[in-house]
Amino acid sequence: MSHRYIPLTEKDKQEMLQTIGAKSIGELFGDVPSDILLNRDLNIAEGEAETTLLRRLNRIASKNITKETHTSFLGAGVYDHYAPSVVDAMISRSEFYTAYTPYQPEISQGELQAIFEFQTLICELTDMDVANSSMYDGMTSFAEACILAFSQTKKNKIVVSKGLHYQALQVLHTYAKTRKEFEVVEIDLDGTVTDLKKLEAAVDDETAAVAVQYPNFYGSIEDLKKIHSFIEDKKALFIVYANPLALGLLTPPGSFGADIVVGDTQPFGIPAQFGGPHCGYFATTKKLMRKVPGRLVGQTQDDEGNRGFVLTLQAREQHIRRDKATSNICSNQALNALASSIAMSALGKQGIYDIAVQNIEHANYAKQQFIKKGFEVLDGTSFNEFVVKFDKPIQQVNEELVKYNIIGGFDLGVVSDDFKNHMLIAVTELRTKDEIDTFVEKAGELND
């Protein structure tokens, strides 16, 4: 009789060995040198009852610091936002949860329509013409946007703001290492925004694209209109890495002439967990549609006139063109894209706007409380993040804050020595006045 977790009897094993012409398990591994074979049983404890095992696992899990046990002011790309309850209920349906790339439209209409709706929502938020079905994360989307710019313009220089997420810049440099001819020029900051004079001076006729973040990594809102004016006559592309929740309130990049808008939909329905998985989005203009990486779902009609959805423009993709594909991305984040679509749909246009307003209001309240406490808060018009200077190392402050069940902000000294002892603080719609007041009070005590 087989074990409940190991569904093989000795008879099963013998039948399998006989089928492949081996006399024993040892003969099966005969090609493996004997000195690296483990010639004993694994040192594994005996099995436990499920109730006992659950108690043990819960005891281990209780050691974790989570946003359920602590109040989080940590952002830097991953945020603690409200997710409607309907999100988990919908994405747990088996037809979505287990679905793979819907190559066969006749049996994948639900999945295809869900992706189509995601693309539509992204286009509406960004004010762009076309969006793909998703990317791995915002960093991947950004790097792919830069590669598209090189390909489209046939130029080799890209000008990027140091206000971009430092990990997005790292991914770009990793991509660029495989293309020796590509030059990445990083523009310094003026406070917490891009130094526009240096940016303007760096843009020339050899520039493939200019890339900025909106709001940027330090929480400040860049002047997209001014930046776009620097590149209008240079035939360079304008790439904007944007927080999609902020676009519920801020003027979308497409309205400022952006050619490609990328980002991460984590703020919509995707929990903050271990650094992933996330869901990158990629939106662009009709002119660049045939160079978009990843899947595109289009709306069509069948031979009976019924509306249907299919994967379209597949000649761009690596399963068709191999080494000549616009990108090597294959599987995407369709389940997380669905989660974001459901969250956006449940909130609606007004709901997204209201939450965006709450983020600004709560962050501004927190700013004022830090200023009243005597902290230096760096200037800059912000959305839901801002930078505060401390007298003590941020790591030390954060270690002490945890004792009060508070997860402090991001240590910017990790990114640059210019921001040593500076904390990037995120304040979302979920943070209450009492939570903010307690955070500021404890931060003040620890900074003395």
Curated annotation (Swiss-Prot):
Keywords, sorted A to Z: Oxidoreductase
MF terms in GO: glycine dehydrogenase (decarboxylating) activity
Gene Ontology BP, a term: glycine decarboxylation via glycine cleavage system
Class of the enzyme per the UniProt entry, highest EC level: oxidoreductase
Catalysed transformations (reactions): N(6)-[(R)-lipoyl]-L-lysyl-[glycine-cleavage complex H protein] + glycine + H(+) = N(6)-[(R)-S(8)-aminomethyldihydrolipoyl]-L-lysyl-[glycine-cleavage complex H protein] + CO2
Gene3D superfamilies in UniProt: Aspartate Aminotransferase, domain 1, Type I PLP-dependent aspartate aminotransferase-like (Major domain)
EC number: 1.4.4.2
Keyword field contains Ribonucleoprotein: no
Entry annotated with the keyword Ubl conjugation: no
Family listed: Belongs to the GcvP family. N-terminal subunit subfamily.
NCBIfam families the record matches: PRK00451.1 (NF001696)
Quaternary structure, from the entry: The glycine cleavage system is composed of four proteins: P, T, L and H. In this organism, the P 'protein' is a heterodimer of two subunits.
Protein name per its UniProtKB record: Probable glycine dehydrogenase (decarboxylating) subunit 1
The organism of origin for this protein: Staphylococcus aureus (strain COL)
